[in-house]
Amino acid sequence: MKTIPPILWQASTERLAASPTTSYISFLEQTRGLTFNDYQSLWQWSVDDIEGFWASIWEHFQVQSAAPAPGYRKVLARAAMPGASWFTGAAINYAKQCLRWSEHEDFAQKTAVIAQSETQAERQWTWKALASDVAHLQALLRSQGIKQGDRVAAFMPNVPESVMALMASASLGAIWSSASPDMGATSVLDRFRQIEPSVLVAVDGYHYAGKAFDRSEVLVDILKQLPSLRVVILLPTIHKTEHIKEYCNDRGLAYVDMQDFLSQSSTHLAKPSFVDLPFDAPLWIVYSSGTTGMPKPIVHGHGGTIVEGLKSLALGLDINPGERFFWQTSTGWIMWNSLVSALMGGATILQLDGHPSYPNFDTLWSFVSRHRANLVGISPAYIGMCIKEQYRPREHVDLCALKTLGSTGSPLTAAGYRWVYESVSEDVMLASISGGTDPGAAFIGASVMLPIYEGEMQCRCLGSATEAFDDEGHALINQVGELVCTKPLPSMPLYFWNDPENKRYFDSYFTQFPGVWRHGDWLEITDRSILARFTASTE
């Protein structure tokens, strides 16, 4: 018999009382007559009655829909995987859901975005100012003929201008796709050539670990191999713009200096408008490497991103409106999209552009301490670096505002768990999560209702019918099996780009167990409903 690992944390009575999960359970009791005394019963209901569960998420978190109440016709018109049809008749927009807080009298003048980079003074935007800059960029895109369905690609770092460009694109129904500027031209082109963008938002370089990296020649190389482009919006970062501007002029591409444009526009406030879209309208294209061939261009929708994002922020990560959310990420990783999506829940997002440990480990932790971050997201690799260097954040900065520490990207070791509670805080919920780019969601995550055992993930996420299957498709307990999801999630891909028969999409997830999503990880579910995730089963 396996030894049960020690419990490292349990929520206090005060933490539970203030949790959005407690508020949600109270909502279910008041509006549906449902009572849940533990997480397992809540999770079981969420996967047994998936229509009722997702309808409750829509209502409780106030999804903004222009359609008549309740904002849609039917929760789940078709339940098959792939091909589920969610919230038919909805009229929504991701950017509208994020920026609705700018119209809220208690939020409009509060801070929405705080950003720090290696070379710029710290910058902040209120909700009202963020919405105004989005409105100006929206007007720019519209003036260039950008419309619903056009692709807007970004070769950008983790800065507020990237957030604004995403929002402006989404507000029009254009489809966003981003890559980090430290990626090579071949890797970027392997992604963007597949989607034929009309617009490229880009930088001419970036700063990392005290060094300037000139990407102007790489950018011109990228431009040359994207014949679909009509517009280039450049954010000068190292001021190597002449060659880029010259190339755009020679080719007849519209060229806009983003810094000058926003500086001139910010003299007056504006309000963005929003195109009302169906639930399954494409929002962004993200990429996951296949075993062979080009990266998979995975299309996620406005609606699925909205309901999953609202659910996971509040009921998984335990973040309330007005709290502060930081995740160390680049624009080339799905966690950047998740960082931006925290705006939907009224969270202030914190962006750190550059090396998180330059000139020392205090850089990241001083930033989140100074701005009283309630959630800090880092990777197991970064935690491993801190362990190796014997760095203990609690000895250097005040982390009293920290409620949740997120970790994803790879399994977190037991030593990593111990480091969090010995070196960061004894009173923090460690949210070790797994899912990611492909489903646009976490299958395995956290709950403030449950204890945290050393080296183990807490739970199957609400609404996620996650199991560990043997080769014959039988669910396993206390044994390692294939991580699968047996019922559809609203955030699952709409399709892959340029995959008209959905063959590549089907072959990626549904060949081994028909009608069941096979994720490609090993998983063990114990009889305590606590999970351990192992290395990829496809490796």
What are these regions (language model features)?
Residues L28-L34, L76, C98-T126, K240-H243:
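AMP-dependent adenylate-forming
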Residues S171-D260, H371, S379-P380:
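Structural core segment of the AMP-binding/adenylate-forming
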